[in-house]
């Protein structure tokens, strides 16, 4: 057998990409091992790529993980974090029993953490909730959850909070990372989530990355892009960012733009398409309609902030007005090549190269983006703008062409968005503000009419403000670390958590920054210590079975939610008007109403699977996960969100919804791929009754905060390959911690020299909100342009979010972690 040039190039591309991302090459014969290790599948615990791994267990512990060679997503590859998954659960400081702040044998806000039983923990939680509900509205009781929560857990949370306690104040940390993408999907297409799939990578001839360092944040997908680029000379890669990172190593067109100027660049591309007669009129006329967005909409700041007070249309930020092509043309017309260059600082030849790629009808192209796009005070707009250029050219919903929003968490799509753990959402793209949607959910859950409030609760940043202001008095945080990951910690988060009027609960496997700031810590099971399901960025739903038990008294979030529901009777949390509709519910617990309701509890636990463990099923006496999933999945079936039956997912490496007649959907809205598109329609954006997507005209507007004479640099925050989010898991893996032990500040050498600083110096980063001390890096992997510094938030010893501004997109409520003003001095 000969190895031809193409095979050689492909092999080298895969190896090079693997090496760059610290990946392991798959071992095919793991099942054949005779060392007593039992192997089973599970999706990776980290990012939203959705890699499948093989988990090896022995003597009740996870002892090894490998890339799953049978998985289509990662094809046996692991990134460096995935390689060390077996160690994330075994940090020496696992929390193994509930811990309550106590003094003199009673709860005290300033007391020491003292071990208590689960019954004691739930009793004081229930007392606090009931007391608040007697005095205040239900939205005064809140939950802050996560895009790492399993589908089963997320659904159980939504049922308890919205259907039981009648509070819509439940939001995920996905509000910080994916809310703008989700809102723009809903506004543009009438439905959430990408239309394409990862197969686009092998089908396209061009990749444009907007604010996405895929080489470090989605390394397995980057390995596939690298393979595609290095094995075909015609394939081109454009990488766009406010600083140079590892993804630039593969870029044919590397573009550094000024913070916030992506708005101007995208409007220039739209203008270029129009001025050069490259509009796909057949597609536009058949499949789109035009709208104009509200302008001068503010920055999601507190109402008394000067920038917020000056905004004319903050109260109508999300409004869209009927429009037409001519008005859209006028909106983008000012964004000439010269204007885009002036605003962005990007050389004109690079801007033209980019515009021509989008405009060329023969050029297949996929746009990828993540937090650089979404964490933006105009994040919804900029998402709309990238849809605009794909819709104007018809480069959408077809193999190798489309806009693709990548998620940063393993189930930001599957749980936060699809299940609906946001303050305004319900399952399957339904919302609490739509009375018809509420009626559908109440009927399915067998609840009295009017149980679910039709007013959204407090979203993520607003939760912190309301805790501080005393309007939100109970918060249960699960599977996230907002005291480290949220913005403006000193001014807006910490004060509310330590407000003596409030009671804060944190479910966490480790003593995170959030946990040690709470009043009660609940020990939670991790990853394969429970049965679970995730939904990744390409709409792929994946299941796994429990493979080991959690340590000590650790319990899964699912067990915690469902067990906690037993501590409430309907008479204690529902008013007489609701009880009068269904008197049979009087005296019943929320557990009986929501979970042991004849639907969730109707499936028996499997008895024919060797070595099967399911702690929740054993405790509650039925197959809780299956009951929750089948009740939840019924909302989407027949409505474009079809999921397969529960048992199927345990047999496969995931399926991309909608799954109809056992067949997954690769490209939505396109005839021949999507079962909801009728013969002869070609394309159908069926999320709207008229089956047309929206092209939205909006302008460039200034950021919330910019450098000035005192705070003379831009601050951008983000991550590194070795660590994930706040490092709660990865910093407890010795190999990952040693590889990148502490946060750094990356700066241009000339900026350092101008301040009398050198590489390695200890420096102080100072904003209007706070300061941290770190070390300077002028030579490392991230190369900043003059005027901008970059730092990360994984290091609990350097709380970078003391610095960040709590400005949000006014439409989505998503935080802008990428842009605020900072100064750097020697420490």
Curated annotation (Swiss-Prot):
BP terms from Gene Ontology: cellular respiration; Mo-molybdopterin cofactor biosynthetic process; nitrate assimilation
InterPro entries cross-referenced by the UniProt entry: Asp_de-COase-like_dom_sf, CT_Nitrate-R-NapA-like, MoPterin_dinucl-bd_dom, Mopterin_OxRdtase, Mopterin_OxRdtase_4Fe-4S_dom, MopterinOxRdtase_cofactor_BS, Periplasm_NO3_reductase_lsu, Prok_molybdopt-oxidoreductase
Superkingdom, taxonomy of origin: Bacteria
Cofactor note: Binds 1 [4Fe-4S] cluster. Binds 1 molybdenum-bis(molybdopterin guanine dinucleotide) (Mo-bis-MGD) cofactor per subunit.
Binding site for substrate: 793
Binding site for Mo-bis(molybdopterin guanine dinucleotide): 81, 148, 173, 177, 210-217, 241-245, 371, 375, 481, 507-508, 530, 557, 717-726, 801, 818
Posttranslational mods: Predicted to be exported by the Tat system. The position of the signal peptide cleavage has not been experimentally proven.
General function of this protein: Catalytic subunit of the periplasmic nitrate reductase complex NapAB. Receives electrons from NapB and catalyzes the reduction of nitrate to nitrite.
Family, similarity comment: Belongs to the prokaryotic molybdopterin-containing oxidoreductase family. NasA/NapA/NarB subfamily.
Subunit text: Component of the periplasmic nitrate reductase NapAB complex composed of NapA and NapB.
UniProt-recorded name of the protein: Periplasmic nitrate reductase
Higher taxonomy: Bacteria, Pseudomonadati, Pseudomonadota, Gammaproteobacteria, Pasteurellales
């Amino acid at each position: 057998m000969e190895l031809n040039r193409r095979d050689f190039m492909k092999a080298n591309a895969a190896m090079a990409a693997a090496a760059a991302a610290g990946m392991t090459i798959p071992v095919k014969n793991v099942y054949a091992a005779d060392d007593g290790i039992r192997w089973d599948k599970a999706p990776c615990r980290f990012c939203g790529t959705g890699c499948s791994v093989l988990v090896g267990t022995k003597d009740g512990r996870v002892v090894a993980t490998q890339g799953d060679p049978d998985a289509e997503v990662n094809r046996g590859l692991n990134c460096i974090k995935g390689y060390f998954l077996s160690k994330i659960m075994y940090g020496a400081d696992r929390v193994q029993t509930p811990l309550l702040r106590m003094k003199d044998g009673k709860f005290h806000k300033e007391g020491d953490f003292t071990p208590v039983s689960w019954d004691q923990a739930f009793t004081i939680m229930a007392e606090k909730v009931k007391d608040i509900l007697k005095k205040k509205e239900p939205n005064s009781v809140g939950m802050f959850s996560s895009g790492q929560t399993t589908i089963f857990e997320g659904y159980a949370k939504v049922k308890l909070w919205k259907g039981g306690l009648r509070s819509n104040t439940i939001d995920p940390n996905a509000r910080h990372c994916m809310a703008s993408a989700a809102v723009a999907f809903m506004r543009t297409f009438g439905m959430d989530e990408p239309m394409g799939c990862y197969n686009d990578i092998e089908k396209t001839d061009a990749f444009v990355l907007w604010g996405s360092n895929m080489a470090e944040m989605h390394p397995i997908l980057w390995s596939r892009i690298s393979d595609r680029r290095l094995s075909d000379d015609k394939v081109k890669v454009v990488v766009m960012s406010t600083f140079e990172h590892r993804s630039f190593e593969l870029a044919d067109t590397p573009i550094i733009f000024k913070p916030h100027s992506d708005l101007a660049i995208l409007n220039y591309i739209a203008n270029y398409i129009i001025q050069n007669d490259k509009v796909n009129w057949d597609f536009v006329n058949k499949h789109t309609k035009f709208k104009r967005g509200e302008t001068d909409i503010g920055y999601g700041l507190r109402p008394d902030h000067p920038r917020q007070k000056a905004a004319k249309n903050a109260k109508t930020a999300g409004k869209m007005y009927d429009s037409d092509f001519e008005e859209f043309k006028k909106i983008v017309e000012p964004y000439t090549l010269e204007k885009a260059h002036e605003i962005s600082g990007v050389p004109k030849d690079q801007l033209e190269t980019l515009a021509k790629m989008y405009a060329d009808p023969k050029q297949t192209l996929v746009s990828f983006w993540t937090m650089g796009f979404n964490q933006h005070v105009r994040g919804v707009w900029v998402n709309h703008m990238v849809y605009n250029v794909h819709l104007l050219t018809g480069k959408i919903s077809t193999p190798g062409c489309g806009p693709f929003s990548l998620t940063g968490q393993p189930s930001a799509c599957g749980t936060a968005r699809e299940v609906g753990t946001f303050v305004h959402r319900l399952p399957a793209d339904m919302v609490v503000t739509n009375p018809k949607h509420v009626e559908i959910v109440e009927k399915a859950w067998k609840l009295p009419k009017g149980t679910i409030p039709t007013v959204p609760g407090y979203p993520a940043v607003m939760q912190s403000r309301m805790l501080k202001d005393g309007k939100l008095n109970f918060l249960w945080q699960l599977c996230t670390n907002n005291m480290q990951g949220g913005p403006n910690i000193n001014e807006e988060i910490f004060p509310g958590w330590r407000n003596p009027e409030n009671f804060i609960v944190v479910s966490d496997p480790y003593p995170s920054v959030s946990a040690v700031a709470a009043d009660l810590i609940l020990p939670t099971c991790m990853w394969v210590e429970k049965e679970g399901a995730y939904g990744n960025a390409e709409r792929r739903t994946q299941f796994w079975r429990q493979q080991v038990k959690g340590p000590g008294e650790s319990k899964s979030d699912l067990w915690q939610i469902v067990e906690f529901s037993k501590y409430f009777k309907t008479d204690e949390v529902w008013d007489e008007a609701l009880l009068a509709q269904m008197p049979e519910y009087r005296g019943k617990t929320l557990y009986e109403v929501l979970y042991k309701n004849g639907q969730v509890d109707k499936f028996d636990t499997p008895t024919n699977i060797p070595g099967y463990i399911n702690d929740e099923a054993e405790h509650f006496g039925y197959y809780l996960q299956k009951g929750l999933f089948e009740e939840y999945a019924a909302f989407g079936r027949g409505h474009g969100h079809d999921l397969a039956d529960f048992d199927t997912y345990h047999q496969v490496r995931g399926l991309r919804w909608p799954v109809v007649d056992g067949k997954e959907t690769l490209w939505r809205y396109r005839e021949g791929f999507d079962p909801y598109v009728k013969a002869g329609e070609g394309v159908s954006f069926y999320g709207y009754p008229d089956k047309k997507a929206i092209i939205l005209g909006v302008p460039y507007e200034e950021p919330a905060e910019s450098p000035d004479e005192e705070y003379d640099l831009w601050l951008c925050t983000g991550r590194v390959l070795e660590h994930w989010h706040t490092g709660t898991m990865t910093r407890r893996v010795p190999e990952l911690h040693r590889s990148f032990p502490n946060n750094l500040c990356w700066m241009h050498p000339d900026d350092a020299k101008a301040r009398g600083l050198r590489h390695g110096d200890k420096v102080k980063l100072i904003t209007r909100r706070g300061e941290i001390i770190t070390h300077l890096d002028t030579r490392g992997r991230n190369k900043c342009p003059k005027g901008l510094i970059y730092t990360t938030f994984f290091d609990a010893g350097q709380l970078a979010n003391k610095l960040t501004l709590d400005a949000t997109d006014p439409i989505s409520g998503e935080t802008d972690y990428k842009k605020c003003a900072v100064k750097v001095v020697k420490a």
